[in-house]
Every structure is written in structure tokens, then in C-alpha cells.
From Swiss-Prot:
One of its GO terms (biological process) is lipid A biosynthetic process. Its EC number is 2.3.1.191. This is UDP-3-O-acylglucosamine N-acyltransferase 2. It catalyses: a UDP-3-O-[(3R)-3-hydroxyacyl]-alpha-D-glucosamine + a (3R)-hydroxyacyl-[ACP] = a UDP-2-N,3-O-bis[(3R)-3-hydroxyacyl]-alpha-D-glucosamine + holo-[ACP] + H(+). Homotrimer.
Length: 343
């Protein structure tokens, strides 16, 4: 259950309302007027909490839960207690997300500009923005309407931020154009120089980075994630991408629409990801590669060559999942101690 010290849920809601919000179907039309006061885990729920079942391993908890209402996939309906009201959805996790948004809507403060914020006179600030203490907004920067900018955040010269963005505390943004409905979590760094040098025996010679960073609409950038600007071209993050905490995106990288980049991933310069690519935790990709649409790199996979659309790869170096599994089986066999011959 949530900690009401920090988050108090809206509601209560009738189950019929939650069915409409989530696009779910009330099983056998039962429970329309049942009230739901909040969301909870199966093991912690009380009578008027709504729970969710989306994996078979939780069937025992479903049987023993005190909750009277459950979001459930159609394949699990037959396992639910007879006394339980069911919201049936082919993707229970999506239904849960939509219902959770209703219980915990984003709080948007009224327009406010702190007296300690430093805003250059040529900057343009949209209507109803919340700009916290210690914020700096540079020359010719443009901030869209309804934006929230957290404490001690730096917005550099010429940066453009679209409407209804949330830029949290201690973020720095330079050389960037950011779309609408973007969320950037604390400590993120966007638009700094990339790691580009020309080297010989006499030293390392810096390559100036004259490009920028382009971030689309409905993107989320995790805490302490770094996105370097391009050298001559731009670094691009397309619409609906999700970048977790502690991700490194090198200069000139392109990340296609809807891609998911999990924590501690590193993407070296000029690599291009197609749409809906997933890079799982601690995956690494060297520079100047292409990762095709819908491809997946499993956790800690290290990619040294192009990956085709739809492929799933893992290991170090990353290979197809079937080949990786063969390698693991071989290693297990190879390192297994041999029995001593009988004397």
C-alpha cells in the first residue's frame, strides 16, 4: 500500500468507473457499484482495495487475498474466487497503469517564478509556469506553457522546451530542443560536449561539438542520465522513448520512437537504434552500429556488430539468444569436474 505521508489517493471510485477508465470489462457485469478506495498488492490488500493478477506465479496469493476486486487477464478468470469482482483486460498491467493514474494524478502547481530565479531578459517564458528557486534560464531560451522547472536547474542559451514539461531539480540543459510533455528527472545532464578526440603520440586533440540534442514528445529521461550533444549532427531521442537512471548516450546517437533504455546502459557515439528497441540493464553498444526496429539486447549484453530488426541478443560479445544459451551449456559441461577413473 502507498505511504499516505507522501501520496494520498484520489477516489473512492466505483468499479464501473474504473472499467471505463482502463478499457476493462466487468466480468458477468457484476460489481458496478462496488467502491474501490485504493490499490494494493495481493498479499497486503483489504476488502475495498483493487489488486492485479498478470502472472501465474501469483495465483496462490489471489486465492488468499482479502481484496474483493481484481484486474485480471482473461486466461486467469477461472482461478479467481467466486466472491471476487473482476476487471478483465488482455493487458492487465496496462489497465493497472491507467487506473493508477486516476488514483494518483500528477499534481501541477499554480504558476510561480521564485525571486531567486535568474532569467535573462531575452528568454521567453510561457504562461502558468512554475520556476523554482535557484533556476537559471539563459539568453533567447524559450520555455513552453505549463512547464515546471525544479530547484537549481540550468537552462542554457537558446534552449527550447515545449509545453507541459517537468524538469526536476539540479538538471542542466544546453544546446537542446525538447518537445512537449517531457519529464526529466533530477541530476540529468543534456547537451554537454561529447567524448570526441583525435589522438596521436603527442596527445589527445579535442573535437569541438557544434551539434545539439533533439528530444521528441512524451519522453522520460531518468535521474543522472547523460545525453551528449552531437559533433556536427544532432543527438536525437524520438517520441515516447523511456530512458532509465544512469544511462549514457554518446554524441550523434539516434534512438528511435518508443525505445526503452534501462539503467546503466551505455551507447557509444553515432550508433542508431530503430523504433521500439529495448536495451536491458547494463547493456553496452559500441559506436557506429545500427540496431534494427524491435530488437532486444538482454541485460549486460555487449554489442559489437549490427543487430537486425526483431532479433534478441545477449552475452559478451552479444549473439542470438539460442547461440548464447548453447555457449552457456557448453561452458557448464566444460568446467564440470571429471570423475576419477576407478582403480
Amino acid at each position: 500500500m502507498s505511504n499516505y505521508q507522501f501520496t494520498k489517493p484520489a477516489g473512492p471510485f466505483y468499479l464501473a468507473e474504473l472499467a471505463e477508465i482502463s478499457g476493462s470489462t466487468l466480468y458477468e457485469g457484476k460489481g458496478e457499484a462496488f467502491t474501490v478506495s485504493g490499490l494494493a498488492k495481493l498479499s497486503e490488500a483489504t476488502t475495498h482495495n483493487l489488486v492485479m493478477l498478470h502472472q501465474k506465479k501469483y495465483l496462490k496469493e489471489l486465492k488468499n487475498t482479502a481484496a474483493r476486486a481484481c484486474i485480471i487477464g482473461p486466461e486467469y478468470v477461472k482461478f479467481a474466487p467466486d466472491s471476487m469482482y473482476l476487471l478483465v483486460h488482455p493487458n492487465p498491467y496496462k489497465a493497472f497503469a491507467l487506473i493508477a493514474q486516476a488514483f494518483y494524478p500528477s499534481e501541477k502547481p499554480a504558476g510561480f517564478i521564485a525571486s531567486s530565479a535568474a532569467i535573462e531578459t531575452s528568454a521567453v517564458i510561457g504562461s502558468n509556469c512554475y520556476i523554482a528557486h535557484g533556476v537559471y534560464i539563459g539568453n533567447n531560451a524559450k520555455i513552453g506553457s505549463g512547464c515546471q522547472i525544479g530547484v537549481n536547474t540550468y537552462i542554457g542559451d537558446g534552449v527550447t522546451i515545449g509545453d507541459d514539461c517537468l524538469i526536476e531539480d539540479n538538471v542542466s540543459i544546453r544546446h537542446a530542443v525538447i518537445g512537449k510533455h517531457v519529464v526529466i528527472y533530477p541530476g540529468a545532464r543534456i547537451g554537454q560536449d561529447g567524448f570526441g578526440f583525435a589522438s596521436d603520440a603527442s596527445g589527445h586533440y579535442k573535437i569541438p561539438h557544434a551539434g545539439g540534442v533533439i528530444i521528441g514528445n512524451h519522453v522520460e529521461i531518468g535521474a543522472n542520465t547523460c545525453i551528449d550533444r552531437g559533433s556536427l549532427d544532432n543527438t536525437v531521442i524520438e517520441d515516447w522513448c523511456r530512458l532509465d537512471n544512469l544511462v549514457q548516450v554518446g554524441h550523434n546517437v539516434k534512438i528511435g520512437k518508443g525505445s526503452i533504455i534501462v539503467a546503466q546502459v551505455g551507447i557509444a557515439g553515432s550508433t542508431e537504434l530503430g523504433e521500439y528497441v529495448t536495451l536491458a540493464g547494463q547493456a553496452g553498444v559500441i559506436g557506429h552500429l545500427k540496431i534494427g526496429k524491435g530488437a532486444t539486447v538482454l541485460a549486460s549484453g555487449k554489442v559489437y556488430k549490427n543487430v537486425k530488426s526483431g532479433d534478441r541478443v545477449g552475452g559478451h560479445p552479444a549473439v542470438s539468444i539460442s547461440d548464447w544459451q548453447k555457449q552457456i551449456r557448453f561452458l557448464k559441461t566444460a568446467i564440470k569436474p571429471k570423475k576419477s577413473p576407478k582403480s
